[in-house]
Amino acid sequence: MASENMTPQEYIGHHLNNLQLDLRTFSLVDPQNPPATFWTLNIDSMFFSVVLGLLFLVMFRSVAKKATSGVPGKFQTAIELIVGFVHGSVKDMYHGKSKLIAPLALTIFVWVFLMNLMDLLPIDLLPYIAEHWLGLPATRVVPSADVNITLSMALGVFILILFYSIKMKGIGGFAKELTLQPFNHWAFIPVNLILEGVSLLSKPVSLGLRLFGNMYAGELIFILIAGLLPWWSQWILNVPWAIFHILIITLQAFIFMVLTIVYLSMASEEH
């Protein structure tokens, strides 16, 4: 469906549709009649998240190979500032001993930032190319506005939380943490298990949904501006919102990184 023939409601709905693959038939899903099934894959979210992850690796590897001890270039300086900032954050917040945390925090911060940054592209640019040049029925370009991506990343963090908890405290110590806190008496084990279980499970859920909610709302505002206002007046709201959104993009990447460090630091504490 060409965007110029859409009503505002159809335009907004079209831009909120993902390019989906039905894993049962390996055929593209019709965005106008999507099946209510678990067995669908959001191809666009997967594609852009992988591409941006590879871009991160290529950029940082290139800078690492060309790094000089002399006066660095602007790009090398920017990368060094990011690395120094993340390293300082990990040093301040993580009190355990692990060589994995700093690279993990750096990866999360830059990767989430790049995914968020896609929200600043013109809302119709890549969807127009995908529809008119590639014949794709729908395309969304902001991976972090897809709850499947954010919850998948949060699930990875959750697995690391469990790993470090068991590694540092042992299975017995981890079990005691779940069953003997906050009430240190065997009679309260069921209550403790419920309280600690909810607290533990809420970490990845809140981590993923916070990022998704903020980025989805930001994307939706851009779509509303483009879909409801005439083209000649869109810049009046688009430019201020884009400038403000730069802060949101950076802040959400920072929050995701910080909470990951804090959760892993809590998991690594020995009691």
Swiss-Prot record:
It holds the Pfam family ATP-synt_A. The keyword Ion transport applies. GO terms for cellular component: plasma membrane; proton-transporting ATP synthase complex. The chain crosses the membrane at residues 38-58, 100-120, 146-166, 220-240, 242-262. CDD domains: ATP-synt_Fo_a_6. The keyword Membrane applies. One of its GO terms (biological process) is proton motive force-driven plasma membrane ATP synthesis. InterPro entries: ATP_syn_F0_a_bact/chloroplast, ATP_synth_F0_asu, ATP_synth_F0_asu_AS, F0_ATP_A_sf. F-type ATPases have 2 components, CF(1) - the catalytic core - and CF(0) - the membrane proton channel. CF(1) has five subunits: alpha(3), beta(3), gamma(1), delta(1), epsilon(1). CF(0) has three main subunits: a(1), b(2) and c(9-12). The alpha and beta chains form an alternating ring which encloses part of the gamma chain. CF(1) is attached to CF(0) by a central stalk formed by the gamma and epsilon chains, while a peripheral stalk is formed by the delta and b chains. NCBIfam families: ATP_synt_6_or_A (TIGR01131), PRK05815.1-1 (NF004477). This is ATP synthase subunit a. It comes from Salmonella typhimurium (strain LT2 / SGSC1412 / ATCC 700720).
